Structures are given as C-alpha cells and as structure tokens.
Amino acid sequence: MNKVFTVSIIGCGSRGCDAYGKLFHEQKERFQIVSLCELREERLSRFGREYEVPQENLFTDENLFFQKKRSDALVIATQDKDHVRMCLRAMELGYTVLLEKPITPDKREL
C-alpha cells in the first residue's frame, strides 16, 4: 500500500485552493488535505467543507497554524510579501514546501 501524503495549504485563493487544493483533492489515493489557513473566514469555511477538513484544522491566524507541524507538505500561496517569512517558519518545522513564485518581491530578502 502506498503512503498517502498529508497536505496543508496557507492561502485559499485562486492558486492555493482552486488550483493546488483541487489537484490534491482529486488524487485522494495519494494526497489528503488536512489543514487550511486563510484570513478570509468565508473562503476558509468554503474550502474546509469542500475538501473535508475538520473544523479544528481551519485557521485564520498563521501563528496558531505554525504552533506545530500539521502535515507532510505545505503549500504557501499567500501574498508575495509573506512568502519568505512563512517559508522559513515552515522549514523550521520540517515541512516539504511548495512555494508560489516569486519567492519575494524584496531583493534584500534573498
């Protein structure tokens, strides 16, 4: 039996949940979306229901989300200015990260 990789998504917009979320959800034999983090509660609730994520794994606060590692992999599909900060936090927790481009709009962060 093959391992099912667990996935978390930060940023439930057109890329995070509409593109990546849909891709992972359609391949249930390989992936399971286990947690979501999104500032907009309406999007968070909608995709939580659509992807069957338990209520206790839906976050509007990134600090609460990053209190512990929640999955094998993390998709970071937030605003560009937030990418570096979130990616560093994710790597500290040991996530495999799929980071939307660009890494940062600020050359000083490279």
Across the structure, where does each feature detected by a protein language model lie?
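Beta-loop-alpha module in the N-terminal Rossmann-like domain of NAD(P)-dependent dehydrogenases
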Residues: 53-110
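N-terminal Rossmann-like dinucleotide-binding module
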Residues: 1-52
